[in-house]
């Protein structure tokens, strides 16, 4: 742990902050971020770039890539030598993280005419030369003119700090960007505060029930995330239906969200007043989820940030599923204490491609969670912390014994989130009677209306799946009589409508 902590303290020295001098807010945000992360003033880099999100390859070369290469050499962040073939090679690398600030261009449009030094290949991948600015910058140190296709990522599936990777001069590029400057400032503050106080809350994972056409891998990622969270004592609500979470679904205390597959932000996120837990990580798989970051309702990346997420990932153009961020790897590395930037790049198979990561590159939401002072952290974190501690201490128990002990412990302490999670684990395994019992306990322990309604919805689902629709109907009606009307209660009305016997015509 000592070496890990020393490495963490050295992260600012490995980081540069790049802003657009043509955008006044960009420099102010760069200085704000550098101040929060103790990044030296001489690690701030201003470039005079176009104002548009989408730029040409020529504009990228002239205003971003070539000026940055010169600055890297001038400031001795790179030591470059000329190889036998006459090409430049980066010999040593002092900078590993790059934070692009709001105002920097987002993506490079396709080149229709021949580009000197490029050799396009055949097929849907090697023939394409558009890319995100961020992913292109990650291979800046390769000094290559090859822009078609992808560069295989040597860090993919890695499990060590990027400073230990010597296979290639890799830059881990993320951006602090959002529809508004105030949102970017909030993302910066939330990340720093979550590291101090802990990222506590539940995960919501939205599968798509895809079983063919190569898309089943996305659902495999989602199922793996559920298992990863359970091992760490992070409660999970998992929806494996083809549709996304319903509009009014009570998504309270959302610290992690992973889902797919809708074009624009939808579901509970569009409910008035929805907010993530400060510091939340959220990602939704879609081909154009980050086609723009300037519209709080277009795609997913910008809208998720606008609704309170501190970090997200997305794509600026069609990437193909296997070449998007593998969300199961992303989540696993975050849970193991890596930075957001390291986690994203370890989850990405391809570079010089379509992906972007939006958030503080140095953000480590789970690095300190075993060292956070329980007396200093908010009282509201006690239940989440207790579940995490239980999961770690009892990780050697088999599933049945683990859930039995978890339910006993949670029942004694009235840990509602833990009881609900045990119930959902039992339901996934088809153990409906014990699932219903645990969910009923959780419902009794919760005090907030939306949490109670969510448990009722889950109980009704368990009754229906166990062949007892009348029990589900009775429960929905009983709760509707005593719970005040809310958007979430509309889902109970739907259960009532669906299950009420229709009179014969």
Language-model-detected regions and their locations in the chain:
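C-terminal soluble interaction/assembly domains
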Residues: 274-347
């Amino acid at each position: 742990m000592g070496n890990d902590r020393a490495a963490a303290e050295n992260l600012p020295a490995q980081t540069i902050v790049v802003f657009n001098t043509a955008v006044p807010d960009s420099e102010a945000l760069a200085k704000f971020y550098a101040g929060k992360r103790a990044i030296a003033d001489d690690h701030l880099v201003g470039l005079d770039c176009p104002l548009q999100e989408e730029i040409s390859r020529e504009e990228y070369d002239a205003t971003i890539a070539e000026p940055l290469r010169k600055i890297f050499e001038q400031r001795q962040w790179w030591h470059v030598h000329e190889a036998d073939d006459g090409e430049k090679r980066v010999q040593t690398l002092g900078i590993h993280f790059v934070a692009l600030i709001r105002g920097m261009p987002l993506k490079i449009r396709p080149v229709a005419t021949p580009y000197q030094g490029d050799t396009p290949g055949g097929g849907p991948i090697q023939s394409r030369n558009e890319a995100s600015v961020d992913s292109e910058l990650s291979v800046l140190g390769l000094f290559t003119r090859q822009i078609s296709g992808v560069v295989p990522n040597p860090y993919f599936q890695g499990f060590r700090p990027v400073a230990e990777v010597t296979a290639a001069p890799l830059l881990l590029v993320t951006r602090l960007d959002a529809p508004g400057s105030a949102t970017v400032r909030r993302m910066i503050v939330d990340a720093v505060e979550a590291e101090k106080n802990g990222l506590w809350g539940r995960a919501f994972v939205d599968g798509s029930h895809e079983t063919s056409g190569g898309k089943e891998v996305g659902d495999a990622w989602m199922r793996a995330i559920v298992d990863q969270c359970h091992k760490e004592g992070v409660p999970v609500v998992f929806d494996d239906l083809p549709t996304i979470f319903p509009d009014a679904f009570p998504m309270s205390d959302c610290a992690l969200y992973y889902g797919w597959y809708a074009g624009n932000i939808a579901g509970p996120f569009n409910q008035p007043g929805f907010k993530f837990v400060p510091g939340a990580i959220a990602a939704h798989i879609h081909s154009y989820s980050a086609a723009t970051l300037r519209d709080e309702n277009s795609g997913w990346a910008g809208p998720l940030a606008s609704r309170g997420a501190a970090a997200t990932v997305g794509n600026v153009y069609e990437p193909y599923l296997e070449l998007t961020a593998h969300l199961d790897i992303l989540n696993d590395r975050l849970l193991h204490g890596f930075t957001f930037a390291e986690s994203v790049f370890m989850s990405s198979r391809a570079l010089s491609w379509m992906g972007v990561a939006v958030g503080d590159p140095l953000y480590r939401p789970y690095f300190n969670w075993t060292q956070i002072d329980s007396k200093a952290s908010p009282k509201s974190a006690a239940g989440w912390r207790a579940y995490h501690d239980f999961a770690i201490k009892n990780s050697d128990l088999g599933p049945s014994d683990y859930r039995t002990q978890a339910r006993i412990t949670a029942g004694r302490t009235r840990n509602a989130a833990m009881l609900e999670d045990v119930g959902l684990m039992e339901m996934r395994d088809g153990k409906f009677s014990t699932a219903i019992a645990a969910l009923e306990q959780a419902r009794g322990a919760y005090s907030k209306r939306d949490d109670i309604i969510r448990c009722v919805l889950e109980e009704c689902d368990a009754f229906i799946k166990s062949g007892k629709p009348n029990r589900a109907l009775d429960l929905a009606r009983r709760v509707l009589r005593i719970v005040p009307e809310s958007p979430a209660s509309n889902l109970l009305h739907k259960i009532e409508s669906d299950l009420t016997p229709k009179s014969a015509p």
